[in-house]
């Protein structure tokens, strides 16, 4: 059996030792390096972390959300997925329609002030409940703009209409697998100012060789402790799904990062993680009866023999 997370652990250690301390947009501060790469051989297993529990259900529902072309958190909340809550909540509390307690810089304040954290959690709970109960409210405040689902499946054309990049790349893999243009891009400069969070995953490129499908992701910004473990599992799952539709076997996931950073308030968690011995990586099971990515439901995707250490909690920087 293989332990596939070692490149991730090595990169964490390198950033802690060699990284540059910097200020950042969130006010939290980071330690980072610029330009890093990890490689994961998907034929040996599935590279989800074992040194801490990573909730695979959240990864499945988020990826299916992207592949639906959805940009509204309502679908995620229906699957008890709160990954994107903070960005939608930020839109709500900064709007003229919000008249509740002051939520300025709620991410940092909730870490430093226990009383405020309780107020923040109550406001977030009310927000989530209203998104689920009030469709008009969800349309207005649950939408995150042109994030991944929109860019992947509904890239707006200047002359009108849209491009479905995912379907295009699947068609190209089937017809011209040797192509060097098997690319999906999420970065549209025109949309960046209006997006809740400009795409961190700028583009990814597929590569076919000897019956195997690989992908390389370029990620402009990577939150190494919280975000990147999700990204590794999500794109590894994406490769497997598209490989099944195109009749190929999974090859490699190559993860290239621009600003690879650890937030200052994650240092203790990273140190704890690095003391843990990884287990063998699990295997991925996909329902063999599903032949198109649109057909997959949550129950069609499972991990087999996922043994892991306990959860390590850390705050999200917004």
Swiss-Prot record:
GO biological process per UniProt: dTMP biosynthetic process; dTTP biosynthetic process; methylation
Catalytic activity: dUMP + (6R)-5,10-methylene-5,6,7,8-tetrahydrofolate = 7,8-dihydrofolate + dTMP
CDD domains given in the database record: TS_Pyrimidine_HMase (cd00351)
EC number: 2.1.1.45
Localization terms from the record: Cytoplasm
Keyword DNA-binding: no
Gene Ontology molecular function: thymidylate synthase activity
Lineage: superkingdom: Bacteria
InterPro entries reported for this sequence: Thymidate_synth/dCMP_Mease, Thymidate_synth/dCMP_Mease_dom, Thymidate_synth/dCMP_Mease_sf, Thymidylate_synthase, Thymidylate_synthase_AS
Binding site for dUMP: 25, 180-181, 220-223, 231, 261-263
Pathways per UniProt: Pyrimidine metabolism; dTTP biosynthesis
Signal peptide positions (record): none
GO cellular component: cytosol
UniProtKB keywords: Cytoplasm, Methyltransferase, Nucleotide biosynthesis, Transferase
Principal EC category: transferase
Positions bound to (6R)-5,10-methylene-5,6,7,8-tetrahydrofolate: 223, 317
Physiological role: Catalyzes the reductive methylation of 2'-deoxyuridine-5'-monophosphate (dUMP) to 2'-deoxythymidine-5'-monophosphate (dTMP) while utilizing 5,10-methylenetetrahydrofolate (mTHF) as the methyl donor and reductant in the reaction, yielding dihydrofolate (DHF) as a by-product. This enzymatic reaction provides an intracellular de novo source of dTMP, an essential precursor for DNA biosynthesis.
Subunit description: Homodimer.
Name of the featured protein: Thymidylate synthase
Organism placement in taxonomy: Bacteria, Bacillati, Bacillota, Bacilli, Lactobacillales
């Amino acid at each position: 059996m293989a332990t596939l997370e070692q490149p991730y652990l090595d990169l964490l250690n390198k950033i802690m030792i060699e990284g540059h301390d910097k200020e950042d947009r969130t006010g939290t501060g980071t330690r980072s390096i610029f330009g890093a790469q990890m490689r994961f051989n998907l034929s040996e297993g599935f590279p989800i972390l074992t040194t801490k529990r990573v909730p695979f259900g959240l990864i499945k529902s988020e990826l299916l959300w992207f592949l639906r072309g959805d940009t509204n958190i309502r679908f995620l909340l229906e699957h008890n997925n709160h990954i994107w809550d903070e960005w939608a909540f930020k839109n709500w509390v900064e709007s003229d329609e919000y008249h509740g307690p002051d939520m300025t810089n709620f991410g940092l304040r909730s870490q430093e002030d226990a009383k405020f954290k309780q107020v923040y959690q109550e406001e977030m709970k009310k927000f989530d409940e209203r998104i689920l109960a009030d469709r008009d409210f969800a349309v207005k405040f649950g939408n995150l703009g042109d994030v991944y689902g929109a860019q992947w499946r509904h890239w707006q054309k200047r002359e009108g209409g849209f491009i479905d990049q995912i379907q295009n790349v699947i068609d190209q893999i089937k017809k011209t697998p040797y192509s060097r243009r098997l690319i999906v891009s999420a970065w549209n400069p025109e949309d960046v100012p209006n997006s809740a969070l400009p795409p961190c995953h700028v583009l990814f490129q597929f590569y076919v060789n000897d019956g195997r499908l690989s992908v390389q992701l370029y990620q402009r910004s990577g939150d190494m402790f919280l975000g990147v473990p999700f990204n590794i599992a999500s794109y590894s799952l994406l490769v497997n799904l598209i490989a099944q539709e195109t009749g190929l076997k999974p090859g490699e996931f190559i993860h290239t990062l621009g600003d690879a950073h650890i937030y200052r308030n994650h240092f203790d968690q990273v140190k704890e993680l690095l003391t843990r011995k990884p287990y063998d990586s699990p295997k991925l099971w996909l329902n063999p009866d599903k032949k198109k990515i649109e057909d997959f439901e949550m129950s069609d995707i499972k991990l087999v023999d996922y043994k892991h250490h306990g959860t390590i909690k850390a705050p999200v920087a917004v």
